[in-house]
């Protein structure tokens, strides 16, 4: 699934570096998990925890992990517009379909930034396949929907954090990080 800043191309290299000094059984924390690409590439040799502040995204990850999320068989511009309206009206809504459309079927993976469609690319298929590939790597992961700052005292082990940076494109689905 496309996601602005999702690290899809770099995830395996980042995970190799993060895992390099991690010992067996050591907890791993991804404090701004976003699309979960780095998380999916981390070895499962200890407890894994993933944190994000976007309720529908966290629920989508949980449902993918548990094998209960069913992607739509077809996607339309009208459904995208209706879900966008719903997401803007209720930013705390945890419907995983909002995350699927809002990131996976939006231009460049940017939260409801225009419906992504092209005769040359199957966005629905790509988002569906991308999530299916994460089911196995997400097994056993604890997903938390909280600001990472609120759980720092309970974090131990290896930590990966790549928060949104000041002066870059913001995340409309999340409150400002700066």
Annotated model-derived regions:
Residues 1-178:
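Class I S-adenosyl-L-methionine-dependent methyltransferase catalytic core
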